[in-house]
């Protein structure tokens, strides 16, 4: 990790130092996804079977997972892991139930009633990556709010063979239909529908560059599907003072660095001693990690910033706008009112990012790449939509009519004005 003294940097150097590793949909990825999209749209299930054999090296008999497969997966899963998943589910449910909106109903003036109604998105699709580290925790983060929101149809896609923990978590959370389909083809199938895979209105979940590009494409297609967010490489910024435990700080940096070679981790501290001790702790802990090679690649483009004080630390963090922000300082909550840009915040020495990733209750699907300046972590609201209602009594209409007529005339929208004038003339 490169260590930089913040006050010694020029404005241009500061901007450069906070730049994330470049991401782009390379031409070959875009072309490959184009071909997959055209194939799945044209050939439906046939294309999905062929692509599973090509990419996943699995010859499927059925795209849909059977109830028997789900039951057998639950039987194979260790009881300890089942209990852990159930406990995490309880906390995630509690946090997302607290987000159920209170519907607004207000009389803006006498005889003029305005409301906000919330309705679930009817059909949602959840994408869960497979591979060597299947993200069954993401099933909880997506399926639980979908269920609480009241989505009428919840389907899930994951590459075959689907891990037992994913099947167990999906069934536990009430996912009705699970398809053993992965990659860009799964996103396309959910967006447009096939003979077997149900078309959905919105797609949620992370994935590799091909999945990300497929989500981008279907979200821009006229008859495609909306998406939760465009995901970039994962990232964490740790803000720590001289009282922080360097072993704790190092473990938080590494827990993010092990996600991928394109991940980025940042330490911001006013303490040069802590910075040095954290670097040493990182080196020690790296030797114990099975994914140390991946973590080392991420550390190569990561940074340590030495700030003048905690206020400057917060300013640097707000400028970077991290996906995850770990605050390991004395009286960490005192800084909360000054933090403007972060996806999820972890306050205090005993709130590592891992807790939010799995079981504290908050959602781990977060904006990356600086989008926390304008975007929020995934929540219940993402699985629903708002409708506004207005209802005017004859007297309420009459009292407001002049205001609307004047405004419509000023904008030269005569039909708007006339819609009021005609009614006004008929009120006795």
Swiss-Prot record:
Keywords: Amino-acid biosynthesis, Histidine biosynthesis, Metal-binding, NAD, Oxidoreductase, Zinc
EC number: 1.1.1.23
PROSITE patterns in alphabetical order: HISOL_DEHYDROGENASE
Bound cofactor: record note: Binds 1 zinc ion per subunit.
Secretion signal, residue range per the UniProt entry: none
Binding site for substrate: 234, 256, 259, 324, 357, 411, 416
SUPFAM superfamilies hit by this protein: ALDH-like
Active site: 323 (proton acceptor), 324 (proton acceptor)
Residues that, per the record, bind NAD(+): 127, 185, 208
Necessary cofactors: Zn(2+)
Keyword field contains Cell division: no
UniProt: Zn(2+) binding residues: 256, 259, 357, 416
Catalytic activity: L-histidinol + 2 NAD(+) + H2O = L-histidine + 2 NADH + 3 H(+)
GO cellular component, one term: cytosol
InterPro entries named in the record: Ald_DH/histidinol_DH, Histidinol_DH_CS, Histidinol_DH_monofunct, Hstdl_DH
GO molecular function: histidinol dehydrogenase activity; NAD binding; zinc ion binding
Protein role: Catalyzes the sequential NAD-dependent oxidations of L-histidinol to L-histidinaldehyde and then to L-histidine.
Assigned protein family: Belongs to the histidinol dehydrogenase family.
UniProt name for this protein: Histidinol dehydrogenase
Species of origin: Mannheimia succiniciproducens (strain KCTC 0769BP / MBEL55E)
Taxonomy of the source species: Bacteria, Pseudomonadati, Pseudomonadota, Gammaproteobacteria, Pasteurellales
Primary gene name: hisD
